[in-house]
Amino acid sequence: MKFFIKNVLLEEEKSDCIVIGVFEFCEFKYSNNYLNKSICSYINNFIKKGDMQGKVGETLLLYDVPNVVSKRILLVGCGKKNRLNRYYLDKIINKSMKILNKFSIKNIIFSLTEINIENYDIYWSIRTIVNSINKYLYKNFKINAFLKKEVYLNSISFHIIEKKDFHIANNSLKHALAINSGITAAKNLADLPPNICNPLYLSLQAQKLSEKYKDKIHVTSIDIKEMNNLGMNAYVAVGKGSKNKPYMSVIKYSGINNTEQEKIIVLIGKGLTFDSGGISIKPSNNMNEMKYDMCGAAAVYGTLIAAAKLNLPLTIIGILAGCENMPGGNAFRPGDIITTMSGKTVEILNTDAEGRLVLCDVLTYVQRFSPNIVIDIATLTGACVVALGNHFSGLFSNDDQLAYALEKSSRQTNDKIWRLPLSLEYEKELHSNFADLSNVGRGKAGAITASCFLAQFSKKYTWAHLDIAGTAWKSGKNHGATGRPVELLSQFLLNESNFLKF
């Protein structure tokens, strides 16, 4: 798929279809730089007759419009003026793409970038539209590949009216395509079946990044032998029941113009390629979805791809913490006491609370990099899904400034997060009579007590935890990975690197 920015007279541009937005209860008006008066009058006739009312997602396909070189114009309803937001825009793009695909259209021009989207300028309009298009294309290409159907669409252009906006629009498109490459990579990795995507496979995918981006990315793979030597006993314990041994990939991205004084940002992704629950085995219902317990690692993988394509002037260390939690003769048990890499001891009360055991050793391991910021991303708790549902990821942090920066990135991208508390009252729930900590709380607020557990191992640096258990994938009709929070993390890195949109 090719994308372009164009500053041309729409009626003179050749394409299979021009997509134009129409507001509800509004006369269609375009300046001479868009379409001339006779074309606007022609379109207004359909609006006056009631063929197009402008309701969100409503469409009307026009053929052979007088004085227009393109073969078709697709009118798409944008709802009430000044109320068009990202949610509605997503619906509009989805409906438009369905119509375009139905008629085997190969190249299109989107003129929606001139429509006023709530709180968005031209930069964010294009970012948002590209993101919506890629969401549709990802799903559609997968279905067509399965059904062995041809995909026709191969070129999308964005029309802008002001030449002064061309550089901004071009930058936006570059950013959008880089970030969406990361989102797609994360989805592709997460959607793989667990008999293919095991910890070794995850490690090999990381190695391929060093081959593809050899001037920017260096990868080190740490196997179970080295983990044992490092004292990562909690991490190793989780993988003991499986024949697929754990692998941890350390991916170092060194961006352009980075110096010794640059911030070092560490991203840690929980990579449980399958989580049966271990001895504390999960119910069989929906256990197939536990292949998605590595979506944190997939998100880190995708974010590093985006960073490499954006050439961000940062030093980023990504950790893919690959492991598989299975029952077996060597599996760890409820009642076990494990000495973590930090020296703290943990009493195991539930082997299905395994992600925090993997992460606690990784959080200790990354101290060697003297990081300025550490963010871990994990499908950590079902309790977070109960608290926030499937729309918001949970945010926990020991630093208000970092939490604010992540919340800002969330607002910019609409990749929603909600901050939850960390406090001593909740830490008391992790009390053990036999060890420093137990691996689960004894009361309620499971997402918070899990984060309090992680906080015990992240006191030496600025840290945040994203619980993506409710947002990493969708069930039901649209079953599949979402690629979240790659866009949020990529925007956070853009903001940290002061990569201005202009």
UniProtKB/Swiss-Prot annotation:
Gene Ontology, cellular component aspect: cytoplasm
Cross-referenced Pfam families: Peptidase_M17, Peptidase_M17_N
Keywords recorded for this protein, A-Z: Aminopeptidase, Cytoplasm, Hydrolase, Manganese, Metal-binding, Protease
Binding positions (Mn(2+) 2): 270, 275, 293, 354
UniProt xrefs under PROSITE patterns: CYTOSOL_AP (PS00631)
This enzyme's EC code(s): 3.4.11.1, 3.4.11.10
Main location: cytoplasm
Catalytic site: 282, 356
Record-level GO BP terms: proteolysis
Cofactor: Mn(2+)
UniProt-listed CDD domains: Peptidase_M17 (cd00433)
Paired cysteines (S-S): none
Record-listed Mn(2+) 1 binding positions: 275, 352, 354
Chemical reaction(s) catalysed: Release of an N-terminal amino acid, Xaa-|-Yaa-, in which Xaa is preferably Leu, but may be other amino acids including Pro although not Arg or Lys, and Yaa may be Pro. Amino acid amides and methyl esters are also readily hydrolyzed, but rates on arylamides are exceedingly low; Release of an N-terminal amino acid, preferentially leucine, but not glutamic or aspartic acids
Domain of life: Bacteria
UniProt GO molecular function: manganese ion binding; metalloaminopeptidase activity
Cofactor notes: Binds 2 manganese ions per subunit.
HAMAP family xref list: Cytosol_peptidase_M17 (MF_00181)
Family of the protein in this entry: Belongs to the peptidase M17 family.
Role noted for this protein: Presumably involved in the processing and regular turnover of intracellular proteins. Catalyzes the removal of unsubstituted N-terminal amino acids from various peptides.
Xref: PANTHER family: CYTOSOL AMINOPEPTIDASE, LEUCINE AMINOPEPTIDASE-RELATED
Identification of the protein by name: Probable cytosol aminopeptidase
Origin species: Buchnera aphidicola subsp. Schizaphis graminum (strain Sg)
